[in-house]
Structure formats: structure tokens, C-alpha cells
A protein has these predicted regions:
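Beta-lactam-recognizing serine transpeptidase/beta-lactamase-like catalytic domain environment
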Residues: 311-319, 359-409, 414-644, 652
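Second-shell loop/turn segments in exported
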Residues: 36-39, 53-58, 106-109, 146-151, ...
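Solvent-exposed, polar/charged alpha-helical surfaces in well-ordered, non-transmembrane soluble domains
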Residues: 33-40, 44, 48-52, 65, ...
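Extracytoplasmic/periplasmic proteins that interact with beta-lactams or build/remodel peptidoglycan
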Residues: 81-352, 372-396, 404
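Sec-dependent N-terminal signal peptides of Gram-positive bacterial secreted proteins and lipoproteins
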Residues: 3-28
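Short beta-strand segments enriched in hydrophobic/aromatic residues
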Residues: 104-106, 265, 545-546, 643-646
Length: 670
């Protein structure tokens, strides 16, 4: 009997313990469930729902409006995002509450941070568990009366330097022009009129900025002006109520001549921010939009730093800190004076020009015309600029120096070099050509190749280059043959992707990389067909005449790529003199196509070219582009190519010829 009673007592005790355990587990689960709800709305930064889950005494301690304001202000200031909360244990304090330790990670303006030693206390009220809140649920170290502060450490963007180490782009100061409304009120209409005239902006724009302001003691920003624009600044400083302050800004040197090459920075867009969301950008960041500023964005941009800290009286308690990391400088091979000279010679005509040093491969100039002054994007657009840009209809942003074009007769150097190397061309031997038209045979149907001049005699290489005889070079190309021509062109980099620090369109020998059709091969020989080259490709090809047949690896970023090395052995050294003689005749001989490009004291080899853009041979409405390329061959310093678009009935290749002559004379004699 006693034994049975003992067994019964043991059974009942076990049941009681189990019930207690289940009840305890159930309570802890309820608390964790409640905290998980709080955690989820916290991660979403749903501060209203967070406040709704506070205990009664917590709501007495802090009102809803203050709660929302504190979290919004703090999280906004630190740029909190991508939050995560992990429970790391539990501690039962009494029968009605449970403390849940947790850690938090988030992305902030100082990078990703981890906050440890959080503890949330949950208490039961009306059959539900509530959060017992205090300041330590903002940051674990935080106490009442503490303030959260943020210091920004701004990184400096790397500078862009020219070959001499002078600035083409740098972080500097501009002058911010603003109006102090209360001091501007007297004779306001006259002041607005005067200010608009000085700045070349509309009076209505100034009026709109003033109308949007509600506090007469608040400065109203109008525009920013370059600090060396002394005429504007002096005239503005005499107007009462105008305030001029320094403002950090990107600043460019070189004006329109460097616009398409250097590019510009401006505020990041929402789309750009999304596309670069893991790179440390914020909604206040500047980002490269074009040119070198865009190509080298990752190198130039700095990484901003900062510190998040708690201010407790005189004490500063650091939460997280990251030092700013300045961007890297870039040194270019560009000669800014040469760049400016080329641009001024082009006089706004649509086209492009590239100059290289034949001995080193350094790119001395890369010009696109028309262009823009990058400073417009960090200051403002005057009415004059707006009118000019409306007429250009976006043409100023078309970066032409990295476009590819039909090279026209400038291709004849490539054809001649291949012919000499292949042994199918004897420079002294005359070719019998009669008339101004030619076709290989009747299989060409009605298609004929034409030339401008019939000298009435057999012509050799020198004559053919000097007179720019298309028939001669078409026949040389046919004698070379498809495979040899394609392979020979590759010795000049044609049809290959060029290794260069600036994105360029790739040259091509034809659309399908073959020259299997006779007419296409023949046309390619004198620069028509489907062959395409950039101004850089053309300048490099002719640089071989000044460097014993070698083409150097083109270099733009000399700070990173400082070693000169051969890229292509384009022409056999023993063949160079014959080519120099032939292509110098274009300039040195009185009847050469570029006789007016001679520079006293220097031997210059070069070639004019006109490339036709038309549907077929009968099309007379097509446009023409004019080329000229030149290289000084003795102690060679420069090879320069230039293309001017749409020169038909306007002077043809004589337009770039005159421009390049002036540039060569300037550069060689300076």
C-alpha cells in the first residue's frame, strides 16, 4: 500500500515539474516571439510600430513624437541601412520579465558597424509582452541626456595632372554668390537687373530664388563663380546685399579644349546610386560623368570617413570611426598647350585630332570639337552658353576622338608598307594606268575605281602617294591578296583591340573581318571599303615613319604606365626610307596634295585623305570627311592626325591640312 502511495506521489511530482517546465518554456517563447516582432519592425525602421510595443512606463518616459523624432534624426544622420539583429542569449530577471541580449549590425556613413551588449527587457502587460525602453536601445552605451553626434571626414578626390604635373582637374574653391534678403531690399529691382547682367543670367531666375525663401536673414544661394573670374566678382562685390563666400568644388583648367577628354563630375543620381550601392556612395556624393573623370572614377574618388559618437557633457564616447581615404592622382601625357592650340585651330568645326610622340608612344593631345568647358558643370550655365548649346544640339558632348571613321587615303601608307614587305611593290617601278577610271575585268560589272589626276605617264610609288592615286593602291592591294593584306594590317593594329588607358572604338579591316571580295579588297587599299580607324590609329600608323618602322605602345596615364615599349613592328626598317621619301613628297613637292603644309627647317611626311560616306558608287548626296596626318621624320617629336567632318564642297582635306600645318609649325618651333 505504502509502495503504491510512493509511486503515486512520484508520478504527481513529475507531472507538476513537467507542467512547470512547459509553462516556463511557453513563457520564454512568448517573450522571444514578442521581441522578434519588435526586431522585425526595428530592422524596417518602422519607428511608429516600435513605439506601439513599448511598456506603459516607457511611454510615460518618452512621448511618441519625441521617440519618432530621435530615431529618425539619429538614423538619418548616421545613414543607417541594411540592419540585422541577432539574439545571443536570455536572462530571466523575475517572474514577469526577461532580458534578451542581442547584437546589431548596420551599414552607416562610416561603413558597416557591429554594436554589441544590447539588452532588451520585456515585461508582461495585459497578457502581452512589451518592451521596457530607455536610451540604451539606441546605442548600448547611451544614457539619459546623452546626444548622438556625427562628424564627417571628407576625402579629397584625386587630381588629374598634365605631363608637367600641372592641374587639369583638382579639388579647390569656387565663389558662391548669394543674396542676404534683408540687406538687398533697398532698390531691389535695380539690383536684380544689375546682377543678372553681370552674371549673364535671367532676372526671373534670381526672383524665383528669392521668392522661395521665407526668412529675410537666411542667405539665398544664386550661382557659383570661378575664383579667378575677377571681373564678375569685382562688379558683384559693389552691390549691397550680395554675399560672396568660398565653397569647396572640383575645378578644371583648360576650358573647352579639354572638355571631352577630362570630362566632369556632378551629383550622383538615384540610378547611379543604386548601380553603385556597395561602393560607399551616398546621396550627397559626386561621381564622374564623362571623360577621364568617369573612366578613372574608382582611382580618383576618395572614400569619405567620419565618426559616430555620444556626447556626454565634455566627454566624447566613440561608437564607430573611419578615417577618410583620399583618391589617387592621375598624371597624363597630355600637353595642355598643344591641346589648346589644336582646339583653337579647329574653330568649332566637327572633328577630332590626336597627337603622339613617335619615340615614346605618349599621347600628347586628344581633341574633340566642338566641346564644352567642364567648369560649367561646377558653376552655372550663362544665357550665352545655353544659347550656344541649344544650337549645337548635343554635338559638344559627342566624343569624336574615340570614334572610328573610314581613313580614306591615309590608309595608303598601310597598303604601301604591306606591298613593300610582301615584295609585290617596287617603289621605283612605274605602273601603267590610263584614264581616270579602272576595273580589274568585266566581272566587276559597272563598278569602277576612280582617280583625280592622270599624269599621262607610268607612275611609281612616290607619284602615286603625291597624287593620291586610288587606282594605283587598289591594284597594289589586289596584288598583295586577302590573307597577306589582313595580316599586314594587323602589324599596324588594324583589326585588333588596342591596349590603351581610354576606351576607344576598335578599328576593323571589314565588317566580317575578311576581304574575300575583290572589290572590297581593292577599295580597302585606298581607305574606302569597310575599313575603320580612329584618329589615334591613324596617328600611330604614321608615327612609324619617325621611329624606324616601329609603333610604340600608346600611353596616356604615364603615372601608371611609365615605360616606353614597342607595340608593333609595323614596317621593316630597310623599307622606311622609301616610304618617308614618298610621303614627304606630298608636302615637299610643289604639286603634292599638301604642298601648303611645309614647315621650314623640318622634313614632314604626311597624307591628305577624303573619305566618302555614301550608299553606293552612284550616290552623289553622300557626305565627305577630310583627313590630314603628318609626322616630322628627323628627330621625330610629333605625329598628328586630324579629321574634319562634312567637308564636301567646303574645301575637302585642305581644311584639316591648313590646321595641322599651323599646329606642326607651332609645336616644332616652340
Amino acid at each position: 500500500m505504502k509502495s503504491n502511495l510512493k509511486k503515486l506521489s512520484l508520478f504527481i511530482g513529475t507531472i507538476i515539474i513537467c507542467i512547470a517546465m512547459v509553462t516556463g518554456c511557453s513563457k520564454k517563447d512568448e517573450i522571444k516571439d514578442a521581441f522578434n516582432v519588435y526586431k522585425d519592425v526595428w530592422i524596417k525602421q518602422d519607428f511608429k510600430s516600435m513605439y506601439d510595443m513599448l511598456s506603459t512606463d516607457s511611454k510615460s518616459y518618452i512621448g511618441e513624437e519625441e521617440f519618432l523624432e530621435r530615431y529618425n534624426n539619429i538614423y538619418g544622420a548616421i545613414e543607417a541601412s541594411n540592419m540585422d539583429i541577432q539574439i545571443v542569449g536570455e536572462k530571466e530577471r523575475d517572474k514577469k520579465s526577461l532580458e534578451i541580449p542581442f547584437t546589431m549590425t548596420m551599414n552607416t556613413m562610416v561603413g558597416k558597424i557591429e554594436l554589441k551588449d544590447f539588452e532588451a527587457t520585456l515585461v508582461k502587460e495585459d497578457n502581452a509582452y512589451k518592451i521596457k525602453w530607455n536610451e540604451s536601445l539606441i546605442f548600448p552605451q547611451m544614457q539619459p541626456e546623452d546626444k548622438v553626434r556625427v562628424d564627417d571626414y571628407y576625402a579629397k578626390r584625386g587630381s588629374i595632372l598634365d605631363r608637367n604635373g600641372n592641374f587639369l582637374a583638382q579639388d579647390d574653391m569656387v565663389k558662391s554668390i548669394g543674396i542676404h534678403p534683408s540687406k538687398f531690399e533697398n532698390e531691389k529691382v535695380a539690383k536684380i537687373k544689375s546682377m543678372a547682367a553681370i552674371l549673364d543670367i535671367s532676372e526671373s531666375y534670381i526672383e524665383e530664388q528669392l521668392a522661395a525663401n521665407t526668412n529675410p536673414e537666411h542667405l539665398v544661394p544664386i550661382v557659383s563663380v570661378l575664383k579667378y573670374d575677377s571681373e564678375k566678382l569685382n562688379n558683384l562685390s559693389g552691390i549691397e546685399g550680395i554675399q560672396i563666400n568660398n565653397k569647396n568644388s572640383r575645378v578644371y583648367t583648360g576650358g573647352e579644349s579639354i572638355g571631352n577628354l577630362i570630362g566632369y563630375v556632378s551629383p550622383i543620381t538615384a540610378e547611379e546610386l543604386e548601380n553603385n550601392k556597395d561602393k560607399g556612395y551616398s546621396h550627397t556624393s559626386l561621381i564622374g560623368k564623362a571623360g577621364i573623370e568617369k573612366v578613372y572614377e574608382d582611382t580618383l574618388r576618395g572614400q569619405d570617413g567620419g565618426e559616430i559618437y555620444i556626447e556626454r557633457g565634455e566627454e566624447k564616447i566613440s561608437i564607430a570611426k573611419t578615417e577618410a581615404k583620399n583618391g589617387q592622382d592621375i598624371k597624363l601625357s597630355i600637353d595642355p598647350e598643344l591641346q589648346a592650340k589644336i582646339y583653337s585651330e579647329m574653330k568649332g568645326k566637327k572633328g577630332a585630332s590626336t597627337a603622339v610622340d613617335p619615340k615614346t608612344g605618349e599621347v600628347l593631345a586628344m581633341v574633340s570639337s566642338p566641346s564644352y568647358d567642364p567648369n560649367v558643370f561646377v558653376t552655372y550655365k550663362t544665357k550665352t552658353i545655353k544659347e550656344q548649346w541649344e544650337k549645337l544640339d548635343g554635338e559638344q558632348f559627342d566624343n569624336r576622338f574615340n570614334n572610328v571613321y573610314a581613313p580614306g587615303s591615309t590608309m595608303k601608307l598601310v597598303t604601301a608598307a604591306i606591298g613593300l614587305d610582301e615584295g609585290v611593290l617596287n617603289p621605283e617601278e612605274g605602273m601603267d594606268i590610263k584614264g581616270l577610271e579602272w576595273q580589274k575585268d568585266a566581272s566587276w560589272g559597272g563598278y569602277k575605281i576612280t582617280r583625280v589626276k592622270d599624269p599621262g605617264k607610268d607612275i611609281n610609288l612616290r607619284d602615286a602617294v603625291k597624287y593620291s592615286d586610288n587606282i594605283y593602291f587598289a591594284r597594289v592591294a589586289l596584288n598583295i591578296g586577302e590573307d597577306a593584306f589582313i595580316n599586314g594590317a594587323k602589324n599596324f593594329g588594324i583589326g585588333e583591340e588596342i591596349t590603351f588607358e581610354y576606351p576607344m572604338e576598335s578599328s576593323q579591316i571589314s565588317n566580317d573581318k575578311t576581304l574575300s571580295k575583290e572589290i572590297l579588297l581593292a577599295d580597302t587599299g585606298y581607305g574606302q571599303g569597310e575599313v575603320l580607324m580612329s584618329p589615334l590609329d591613324v596617328a600611330l600608323a604614321y608615327s612609324a615613319l619617325g621611329n624606324n618602322g616601329d609603333i610604340m605602345q600608346p600611353r596616356l596615364n604615364v603615372g601608371e604606365n611609365g615605360e616606353a615599349k614597342v607595340w608593333k613592328s609595323a614596317i621593316k626598317a630597310e623599307k622606311v626610307p622609301a616610304l618617308v621619301d614618298a610621303f614627304s613628297a606630298v608636302i615637299n613637292d610643289a604639286d603634292g596634295t599638301a604642298a601648303n603644309a611645309k614647315v621650314d627647317g623640318f622634313n614632314i611626311a604626311g597624307k591628305t585623305g577624303t573619305s566618302e560616306i555614301k550608299k553606293d558608287q552612284k550616290d552623289e548626296s553622300g557626305k565627305e570627311n577630310g583627313w590630314f596626318v603628318a609626322v616630322n621624320t628627323d628627330d621625330s617629336k610629333i605625329a598628328i592626325s586630324m579629321i574634319i567632318e562634312d567637308v564636301k564642297d567646303r574645301g575637302g582635306s585642305s581644311i584639316p591640312t591648313a590646321m595641322v600645318k599651323n599646329v606642326m609649325e607651332y609645336y616644332l618651333k616652340k
